[in-house]
């Protein structure tokens, strides 16, 4: 089963890269998220999931579905953090704010049917110091999906 998933992932990655090289290769990322959740279950690691940089929420959604698929315990909270304003840095060669802003309201609506999901709007360096994030006791899976160094260094 794992082999077939890997083959499908590689084939889809190849197709996506050859259609448009600028398209992010999410299939490999999603495969790794599945693997991490399986290891968390196997090793019985307690704690919440926290994702830094959710953009439109695709990875967060995939992570929730992966955890549910393998019946991860239901008392975990899935935290999603993003500024929803693009990047805090203006000068970057590749990443432009107009390509990376997303709608906080749309993301909130997308996850409204998941009571275990908490979406936090703001910059990481500020939000990590405040409640409710400062009250997190244990994290089993931290996914840092930042596109620039300045943001990831705050995590």
For the regions a protein language model found, what residue spans apply to each?
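Conserved alpha-helix/loop element of class I SAM-dependent methyltransferases that forms part
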Residues: 31-45
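S-adenosylmethionine/decaboxylated-SAM
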Residues: 3-24, 43-155
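Short linear elements at protein peripheries
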Residues: 20-35
């Amino acid at each position: 089963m794992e082999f077939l998933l890997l083959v499908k992932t590689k084939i889809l990655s190849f197709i996506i890269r050859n259609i448009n090289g600028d398209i992010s290769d999410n299939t490999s990322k999603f495969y790794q998220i599945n693997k991490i959740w399986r290891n968390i279950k196997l090793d019985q690691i307690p704690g919440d999931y926290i994702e830094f940089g959710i953009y439109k929420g695709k990875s967060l959604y995939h992570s929730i579905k992966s955890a549910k698929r393998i019946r991860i315990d239901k008392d975990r909270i899935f935290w999603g953090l993003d500024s929803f304003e693009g990047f805090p840095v203006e000068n970057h060669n590749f990443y432009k704010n107009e390509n990376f802003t997303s709608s906080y309201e749309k993301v909130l609506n997308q996850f409204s049917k998941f009571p275990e999901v908490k979406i936090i709007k703001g910059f990481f360096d500020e939000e990590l110091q405040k409640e409710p994030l400062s009250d997190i006791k244990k994290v089993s899976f931290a996914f840092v999906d930042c596109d620039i160094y300045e943001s990831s260094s705050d995590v």
